[in-house]
């Protein structure tokens, strides 16, 4: 007996679907089947062949249609799925549904069929199949997604109630056909390898990933290029590898293959591709070694193993084995994900019911859905199960006495033949194919084990090869299912797919999906599968779908009246009327057809349930132990310890101070500090475990390298906005030019789903068209327009120009008014006499007029007038023939030698003229003035007729020499008289119109023609030159002025130390640790009073940059030495964004940073994002512009004393109370990129320049490269950086209008020096710069690409009377892009932002100057210069080609180029920057890249943005813009606002600036007396934890003369057993010192909390030298208000804020001696020494100490 059943189930469903009645009882033929199938096909219905078999007809087109029942997808039999499920749960019988394909073009129906099962299939299962499909399918000509596995199963485990408890996917033991899918794809078009390889190579791969995996074009891989097909079929309109690749990666991520696992998987796939290049016997040894080297790096294998231990066959076997192992591993991960989701759902359901799920193996059955894509295997399985009576259920029926009529011999022969083709897949071990398979498997195991043991231990490849180290290679054994065993142990249901035609999918008509029908094709499939015989056999005799033991049957149906024993069963069957084969009683079993079984089951379901009797067949389903009730564990209450919050503003609402929003209740989260709980610094765990989290998430350009989260289509609401007239005009213009491109083409072909993206593309297209048109116009005007005005000007030469061509390969001569290039002729031996053609013989004729050397025979060319061959003309010029042997006179009288060709009188016209015409270049021309001049001065008889020049000088000379003999006077007198009377003039009008004159014309043309009049001096030929000359002069003037502006010959000035307070803003994004450390160290080491500079770092989101192993904020905090245990609260603030993205959260850290003896306070703001962002890829990230806006907003509210957000209040508290400087004192903001290093004296120089000129609102210095020799791409940027500063910016600085203050190194004044009016922190600048509606192409380029340049533009717009300067003495260095891809990305941003910003600048009203002497003119010149860069490159290429092809040398163009680069060279030569000579040469070599490649790429990529989905522009019409906005808008109430004074009063904080009657703050004593207190007693309400790095490390005076007793300190960055290296909540409050601690107590990163005893502000002015130490820097706080507030003037940083008396006389003397010992006393001045001393002391001496300094300098000099 078979083991396909266990016992029957007593659990019945409340309903049943009931099967359809079988087909008519008549004989079934192929014709009837064909007709029935066609009818069902046209209606999209399945056809039930028998109770256990269904036929469906599907094509690629119908697989995407909706059926009449509303099902989307291919036609499938849902009832078959329900029947199989009902049988499994009611009969406790394992079932197997076999999905067969009768045609290789039939689409796969596995996923739709799984969805049709009446089971809650977990969604992750379909995701897993989506992840698995690319590994298993490939494009073929007959099927665009053909499965290349033998069998794939989805095995469900069910309870006896029919509920799912498990699901797993598995391949059969036959595995995958890797040879057909990868190793040996057909070498004909239309075939591809497995889809996964093309997904790997698609653009979905990030640049960093492509570089790491060395991914190339598909044609670079030997195994992929066999067919030459690399893209999906064109007949699939939605097929796109890039989109599919994104879905594929998302699916991998969903099933747990992400991070290191996904990188390992991709590395293996890339390695297999490269290993394919090493497969084959014709591979070159060098290519083989290179491929093995690459593969070794990707797979973690020693290349020598692949090269020497593996043969070619071994490498192919290795590819196949690794690929199958990889697929098995993916299936394993998929099954883990499915099991996890199922377990979670079971846990949820058990908790919801209060009862634990308790199932055993005996309580479950299985349904296995097996997909057999190969028609051969499906046919063999089906025919064997139906027609083979020797095994399976057929054999059971025969053994039980059921009459099973044998199949016909023809059918059996077909079955046997079908089985023989696939006997290996069916587990038949007797044939030769089985032995071959076993040999291949053994070989595969041998190779895999040989290579696998050489693989690195921790590599991904070893993980997939050795799934269990103790078991060795288990490929093909573990995780697979045996097809024969599954079929033999289950009740089998067949679902067969028919294809209606043999036509290829590309020939199907998409208009009518069901139109494809070929009776012949369908009939062939029916006959091959013997479906007519199948139906007749099953329907008439053995269509039984249920069978029972007799006792089992009685036990199940006794409630329906079934009697005991076999007789009782037979009687009951007769009573039911089941006598015509509906049920058959065998020897041991009862066999029941589907309709009879359903009838009995339905009656059983309707029968009232009776108390179950004790029966061996009944399960005690209700006897299970009751579940223990579960109680939800309440969440742990928030800590109220010292680290907990005490008074949270967000919870308190407006209890203390009325809310700005009118007392509206805040909707912000009540516990913002819960964000990023855990991990270092409270920023989450990303990057904390470096061993397992070393993957770079972002590269240097901020492009995401990891898996991308899917973009969810959130619900939106629609709003309308007004658009400007200019925008409406521009939109209309764009549509007028692009109307011919339908939107649906952009949507479906261009994959631009959103209207705003399509509109941006149209705008980009129009802009590119206009730019190209303008470039084309420029090129046309310069190159071609002159030729149109003056055609053939380059095809004429005068005598002087001909004489220039005297080279061996540039041999020009003129003969009888025509110019010839005989460079290819003169070297040939063209004389038939003894004269040899040598260089020395020919050189005298280069560039000469050879009229006299080729005299025309008069009798041939003037035959109407000369008949005597002896008549010849003599030359008036005696020097005309200097080499007589070169004269080519022809005729028997002239050449008596009959052997020479010149002997013939016809030589001139027959030989010479045809040959010389081959080298004709153009006409010889003469200026009219020259013709007239020679006629007057040289008595030359020549005239002009019809622009041609004829010369009779030799004619009259010969006539005179021959005494006027009539035979020599052969020309008509009417013509000769004109030459005598009007020499040198135009005689066209006087020319006789006679017959003789007409005859004489031929003679004149051949004998007396001298050329044409030079037309190049005419107005139409000269006007274009003069216009170009005018533009040239204008450009040269601009270049000259720029040169003079840059030519600063003065010595470098050394300004006195400045005392202004400066914020050094450092926005950090994805920079590496080395760059960040270098940048922070450079700011710390600036030669500027450390107390008056603040390093303000803003980390833009939790992002891991390329090459980093931790998020950027954690790297910054690591460098600054912040204690990782610090976890400040996440506080809300308003960011730049759309909708709810405007709400952001940030954390604030503060402290002191020490470097080389300089101790500088810092503030770090980390943008961490909302709670809902934490699962996204870049939580908190809003861009650099948002970082700048954050500090600008903060300083604006400080200036206006306006209400602040919680984050700004915390920043104010940290700066004001912890660091000890009133934020209102800061006057400048130095903006420095995180990877930029600033030279020590740069800040002082910038501040000094601003102090000397109060009109300066912004200033920048020179930026050079740190990595100039790193690669070719950095080398070509060195000179560009240098000259752009010293030429362009220096020139613009003359006008006080530098158009771009680079964000990497510039400084802005915060407010005016006179009246304190806000500048960069003004409302109008912030409002425009913080624009959220960045929804047009122009705004995107301004605000998303060029925010730094646009900020300068806004400053120029709103403060046109202020100056924006460049000073070359301030110097910084930054890292330039080192690869071409990064350079492309950077220049795309720069060039496009430059163009759009210059357009904005050109429209400003108040630019200085007028006409051509205005800044507007310079801006327009720069704009045009940027736009026509490609035209410039094309023109230079044209010049090079023109000169190389023998054209005239463009003297003016060369002079301009020489002038441009010569003047530039003077600049760096004067500055003694000799190295720039080499850099200039490299730059010139790269000019095509800068002037053509980069601009053209940039112009076309103007719309290349990340378009957010929170604000989608749906369209523009009229003066309205329709915008879809997220349903979750930004509510300002989510960010409560409060004034600092109100906040400080409510929290008992010092530093209030108003006249509040503040209560005396509490004092706390301790073991350190009144010098120490708990930090928790002195924090803002947000700093509910101990402030980051704000614990003091010493008592007052803890510098050189500090107290010997030191309290506990914050941990030093490198730990150790140094004193103070333990954590404490106690701090001692001392005055700030910028000197390092004593040895033994020194820490690189000091703490800041120099808090003091609190004093009432009204008494602070009386403190004197013993002033309050309630702040870090000891800055006295005036109690007066600023002009904005209403009392006295704003506190200025010119006051002496040092508090103590400063350095004593001994320190001053020591500094003087040190400085004098280091300087050249012969050249140094007293003023310079004084400046050096003050710089060394880090203090500005005034009063008595200044006088002491002067006296002591004199005394020390006297003593030397």
UniProtKB/Swiss-Prot annotation:
Region called Disordered, residue ranges: 1670-1691
Catalytic function, reaction form: [(1->4)-N-acetyl-beta-D-glucosaminyl](n) + UDP-N-acetyl-alpha-D-glucosamine = [(1->4)-N-acetyl-beta-D-glucosaminyl](n+1) + UDP + H(+)
InterPro entries for this protein: Chitin_synth, Cyt_B5-like_heme/steroid-bd, Cyt_B5-like_heme/steroid_sf, DEK_C, Myosin_head_motor_dom-like, Nucleotide-diphossugar_trans, P-loop_NTPase
Transmembrane segments: 729-749, 765-785, 1027-1047, 1417-1437, 1449-1469, 1477-1497
Deletion consequences: Displays morphological abnormalities such as ballooning cells, intrahyphal hyphae and conidial scars. Leads to sensitivity to the chitin-binding reagent Calcofluor white (CFW).
Membrane topology listed for this record: Multi-pass membrane protein
Pfam families in alphabetical order: Chitin_synth_2 (PF03142), Cyt-b5 (PF00173), DEK_C (PF08766), Myosin_head (PF00063)
Keywords in alphabetical order: Cell membrane, Glycoprotein, Glycosyltransferase, Membrane, Transferase, Transmembrane, Transmembrane helix
EC number, UniProt record: 2.4.1.16
Domain of life: Eukaryota
Main location per the UniProt record: membrane
Induction cue: Expressed during exponential growth.
Start and end residues of each DEK-C domain: 1702-1758
Gene Ontology terms: biological process: chitin biosynthetic process; fungal-type cell wall organization
GO molecular function terms attached to this record: ATP binding; chitin synthase activity; cytoskeletal motor activity
Glycosylation sites: 157, 876, 996, 1392, 1557, 1645, 1650
Intracellular or extracellular location(s): Cell membrane
GO cellular component: cell septum; myosin complex; plasma membrane
Role, per record: Polymerizes chitin, a structural polymer of the cell wall and septum, by transferring the sugar moiety of UDP-GlcNAc to the non-reducing end of the growing chitin polymer. Plays an important role in cell-wall formation during both hyphal growth and conidiation.
Protein name (record): Chitin synthase A
Source lineage: Eukaryota, Fungi, Dikarya, Ascomycota, Pezizomycotina
Gene, per the UniProt record: csmA
